[in-house]
Amino acid sequence: MTVPYYEFLDAGMQVDVASIKGGEIPIDPQSFYYFLITHEDKRFLKDPAFQDKIKNSPSIDDIDFTDYDLIFFVGGWGPSYDFAQSKRLAEKVSAAYYAGTPIMGSVCHGALAFVSAKDTSGKPLVAGRKMTGVTQGQLDFFRIKFTPKHPEEELRKAGADFRANHHPVADIFATVTVVDHEQRFVTGQNQNSGHETAQKMMELLSQRSAK
């Protein structure tokens, strides 16, 4: 979450933080372990304004997705418990898509926000679209069995054209950012895609604004 947040903020954008139910967003303390913590995480720990947004987030019912140029769905374990399961989130993703704005993006488990969204015929909105998320192989490496939804499995099930990078030696670090054919969805494979995915979203927004 911290990487895309500061990418957008440092580019001069107003950045709001919301959650499905609103209120305080739980953060896994393991995110700040010395071998995982990023420069942006350290910046967050010294940023009371950002911390306040996490403690007092509005619910998605309190915001209009079409008021935003970009919407980014964060990764981590949390989204596996409520993104794909939320009928309301699926409805708002579909409505935002058909309104023509915003550009929507995600990294890692964040892509689960898209799998339950439907098109006007009732079919999965992601069907046939290039998309990515953390791979099953990367989850298996860490023996992740406790999360209820896995991005690769759910995206494939919804008919997405799942893309991913692989590395013969260090596959856990392999990553890629992909854009769908309409340039409406930008998805990153895992947390290592945070910078690139946020930057690509802003690049597409700039191109749209220039037309």
Summary of predicted features, one role per range:
Residues 1-101, 112-211:
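Extended, subdomain-level signal for the structured scaffold at the beginning of enzyme domains
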Residues 106-110:
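Short, thiol/selenol-centered motifs that function as redox-active sites or metal-ligating centers
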